[in-house]
Amino acid sequence: MSNNFTKVENPVLIVEGKQADNERLKAESDYLRGTIKDDLQDRMTGGFTSDNFQLIRTHGMYQQDDRDIRAERQKQKLEPLHNVMLRARLPGGIINPTQWLAIDKFADDYTSYGSIRLTTRQTFQFHGVLKPNIKLMHQTLNSVGLDSIATAGDVNRNVLCTSNPVESALHQEAYEWATKISEHLLPKTRAYAEIWLDEEKVETTEADEIEPILGSNYLPRKFKTTVVIPPNNDIDVHANDLNFVAISEGGELIGFNVLVGGGLAMTHGDKATYPRCADDFGFIPKEHTLAIAAAVVTTQRDWGNRVNRKNAKTKYTLDRVGVDTFKAEVERRAGIKFSESRSYEFTHRGDSFGWVEGIDGKNHLTLFIENGRILDFNGANSDSKALKTGMREIAKIHKGDFRLTANQNLIVAGVSAEDKTIIEQLAREHGLINDGVSNQRKSSMACVAFPTCPLAMAEAERYLPGLVDDVEAILEKNGLKDDSIILRVTGCPNGCGRAMLAEIGLVGKGPGKYNMYLGSDLAGSRVPKLYKENVDEAGVLSEIDALSARWSAERNDGEAFGDFVIRAGIVEQVIVSFRDFHHA
C-alpha cells in the first residue's frame, strides 16, 4: 500500500519552461563524447573544462581536488590539485580475485591516496587519479573485464543486489537479473570505448538506434535500481528509483514485486525537496523484468522534470502526476499488467559478519570494513591494520569471488572447507577480523566527504570513527552496551551515506555542524524527521546521551531506538514525505 499520493487531479505530465543547462549539454555532447579527447591532451590544467566537467560523470568519474590543501594552493596562485574519482560498474558487487589484484596494484601505483574505497553503491572507487593516468585507469579495468560506464550522471547507475551467500541458488539468479538489468539499461553510445579504449568511431545518424531507452538527452537525473531478497533489506530499497523485490516459492525465484520512487537527496532550506519511500506497484513474473525496467525508465525519461534539476528525480515525478497515473503508463508501455503484490517482509538491514555456510556447501566470510576504506593503516600499537595487504594476500590464493556489500563491507565468498583456515588466518593477521568490534560500530556508516568530495559541507568518514567511540561509551553508561542504533553521517544532503534511512542521521550543514534527524526503523521502511538544526559535535553527543538515557529507561521490551523516539513523541512519524517531512 502506498504511503504517498496515489491520485492527483489533472496531473501535469510534462513540466514546461526553460530547460536546465544540463539538457543543452547532453543534447550537444554527440552522445556523451563532448570534447573529452581534446581535454585529455591539454596538460596546462589538471582538470576538465566547460561541458566535459559534467560529461565525464557518465563515464564514471567526478572531477575533484584535495580540499585540505586548496587554500594553500590558492595562496601560491596555483589551481586546485585537480584529480578524478572513479566509481566502477559492478552489478551486484561481485569481483573476482584477478580483478581485485589489478585494482589493488593500480591503487598503489597511480592514486594519490593508495586506497580502495568500498561504497554504498556496492562497488569500489579510486580517489586521486591525476589526468595523465586516467586513460590507463580505464584500460586497466578493461583488461580484467571491468568498466565504469554510467556509474554517475543522468543514467541508470550501478545495479545493486542483496548479498545473500546462504541462499546460493536464489542469490545467483537474483544476481543474474541485476546484471541483465544493468546491461539492458546501459547507454548504447560507444563514447566510452572510443575515448578510453581507442575504439574507432562508427558514424550513425539515427538517434533511436543509438539510445532506444535513454534517448538522445538521456534521463532528467540519476536513476538507481536494485534487486533485493527479503527479509534482509541490506541495499535499502527506499533509497532507489526502481527496486525488484524477489519473490520465491520453494527456494526458487518466481518473480518480483516492483517498488518505484524512492530517493534520499534533498537541499537544505528547499521544502520542495525531500527524501521519499518507494511505492509498491505490484507483482510481475520474472520473465517481464526487463520490459518493466525499460517502461519505468522511459516513463521517467519523458515525464521527469527537465526544468528544475532539484525536482527531477523519479520520486518527484510520482508525486506530481500521482502513483496511479505513473503506474498505468508503465503498464501501457510494457504491455503488462501488475498483479497484486505478493507477501514479503523486511525484518532487518545490515550485514551478518563472520563465517556462514551456503546451501551449496561453500563457506562465506563477511568482513567488517570501517567506512569501506581498504588501506594499510599505520597507527600506534593495535591501531595498525594492513587491510589492503591482507586483501591482496587473500586474493592471491582465493578460488571463489569477493562480494562487496551496499554497507561498505566485503564477503570472501565460495571458500572450500580446506581453504577456510588459511583465509581466516590471513584475515586475522592483517586486521580484517576484529572480534572486539561493537554492534554500534557495525551499525554505523558514513560517506567519504572531506577531503575529496567537492559537495561536502562537513566531515563524515573522518568524523565517524571517533564519534562511534564516544557513542559506545554513552550507550555503556546508559546500560545499553549490548544495544545499537543505526547511525549514519553524510557530509551534505545529497544522501550518499543514506542518513535519511537512519535511526540517527547526521547531515552536514557546515564545518563541524550537522542537522540531526531521528526516527527511521530497523527495516529501513521509514524516513526520519528533523530533530535539531546546526548541532555541533559536542551537541551531537549531548543529544545522543539524553535520548539514549530516555530510551534505556522508557522503552518497551525490544523496542528499537527509532520506534521509541516516535512513540515517545520526540519526533513525529513521516508517513507522506511531501506533506510530513518539513512539517514543523
From Swiss-Prot:
Free-text remark on how the cofactor is bound: Binds 1 siroheme per subunit. Binds 1 [4Fe-4S] cluster per subunit.
EC number(s) recorded for this UniProt protein: 1.8.1.2
GO function term, MF aspect, one: NADP binding
Named cofactor requirement(s): siroheme; [4Fe-4S] cluster
Residues annotated to bind siroheme: C496
Pfam family, one: NIR_SIR_ferr
A biological-process GO annotation: sulfate assimilation
Residues annotated to bind [4Fe-4S] cluster: C447, C453, C492, C496
Keyword Kinase among record annotations: no
A GO cellular-component term linked to this record: sulfite reductase complex (NADPH)
Keyword 4Fe-4S: yes
InterPro entries per the UniProt record, alphabetical: CysI, NiRdtase/SiRdtase_haem-b_fer, Nit/Sulf_reduc_fer-like_dom_sf, NO2/SO3_Rdtase_4Fe4S_dom, NO2/SO3_Rdtase_4Fe4S_prot, NO2/SO3_Rdtase_4Fe4S_sf, NO2/SO3_Rdtase_FeS/sirohaem_BS
Binding partners and assembly: Alpha(8)-beta(8). The alpha component is a flavoprotein, the beta component is a hemoprotein.
NCBIfam families named in the record: CysI, PRK13504.1
Name used for this protein in its record: Sulfite reductase [NADPH] hemoprotein beta-component
Source organism: Colwellia psychrerythraea (strain 34H / ATCC BAA-681)
